[in-house]
Amino acid sequence: MTFSGAEIRDKFISYFRDKRGHLALPSSSLIPDNPTLLLTSAGMVQFVPIFLGQAPAPNPPRAVTVQKCARAGGKDSDIENVGRTARHHTFFEMLGNFSFGDYFKKEIIPWSFELVTKELGLEPEKIYVTIFKGDEQNPADEEAYTIWNKDVGIPAERIFRMSRKDNFWGPPGPTGPCGPCSELYYDRGPDYGCSDDPAKCGIGICECDRYLEIWNLVFMELFKDENGNFSPLAAKNVDTGS
């Protein structure tokens, strides 16, 4: 099953708007209303005031967007990989859905799997996922593991526990909303791998094009202050980017 970029965009929007009751909102400007950012680097940037409780959420409190993004420097920069891989770009459109204190992990995890397998036709057995393994600052995301494993049915050998570098998102600037995340990967097959040895080619091991990250589910529930301390946000939110 093959789709054009426009068809994938339309399917993503229609799934969340028509099937999951989201408000479809336009992309915000590439120039963000945020003094800590040079350019809009993620779909959640326009919603930071809502996540922080400084602005009201839309009605209903869930949204879907296709956000124009640029990454040319800073923490989220992909510029060093542009030209080295087939998947990194400085400018791109990020497909995203957002919950402002509405739904959380037990909803978005099964929805994401349904969208990529039933709506977009990816083979379920080729979907791999990662979760935050925890560290001295924040605990492991056992809730996400249980939902993927028990509710969705992803076997343990296709669920990878990853470090903060890979599976804890944000904030987009030095301070702001953040939280653990769970990423979906698609196995394109051994023809795209860099080695037949699983110890050399795999998620978290190499940067080849076999295992392609297709979606990042961020569980936006914390605020990081200027001293590096974390505190709970007033509501548990969802911020995804594909």
Features from the language model and the residues they span:
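Alpha-helical segments
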Residues: 1-242
